[in-house]
Swiss-Prot record:
Gene3D superfamilies: N-terminal domain of the delta subunit of the F1F0-ATP synthase. F-type ATPases have 2 components, F(1) - the catalytic core - and F(0) - the membrane proton channel. F(1) has five subunits: alpha(3), beta(3), gamma(1), delta(1), epsilon(1). F(0) has three main subunits: a(1), b(2) and c(10-14). The alpha and beta chains form an alternating ring which encloses part of the gamma chain. F(1) is attached to F(0) by a central stalk formed by the gamma and epsilon chains, while a peripheral stalk is formed by the delta and b chains. GO terms for cellular component: plasma membrane; proton-transporting ATP synthase complex. The gene is atpH. Belongs to the ATPase delta chain family. It comes from Chlorobium phaeovibrioides (strain DSM 265 / 1930). It is a peripheral membrane protein. The keyword Mitochondrion does not apply. It is found in: Cell inner membrane. It comes from the Bacteria. This is ATP synthase subunit delta.
Amino acid sequence: MSSVIASRRYAYAFLSAAEAGGFLETVTGEMQMVGETLAASRDLQRALASPLINADRKTHLLEEIFAEAVGDKMMLFLRLIAHKKRAGILGGITQEFAALLDEKNGIVNAAVTSATELSDSQQKALSRSLEGYTGKKVRSAMKIDESLIGGLSVKIGDTIFDGSVRHQLQLLREKLVAVEA
């Protein structure tokens, strides 16, 4: 089983259990903190993924790092992950948990790239427009790329809306080349 599939299954199972048990709000913040801790430490990632370190040592490592910072339910989940020899995919589980939670809450992520910085009113108008298009709440991550020349490009999931001047010029170039041929 691929690590992405396994990560999604563990995340889904934990999300479902947390929702049914009424502790989803508590573990959401804890899961985010675990993910941030993993993302900040390559050494921790390597240790959890290492086949040379046994499950008991990984459990002990997770307990040392997180016992004071997370509640009983989250600690039980971390122990389970280590016991099942899935500690190496813990980072993926935290990402999948966040994605499933966003999906449950009707939130989509949009990567917005613009040629210049957008004003607050432009960002709000863009978000409203994207929310109207998707029917979901949009969380935008803004990035500036001057090579776009003007306009912007938006990526939501697998869909890209490219309204940049660079893209329009590229399309025009392709049409001109096709006419000449």
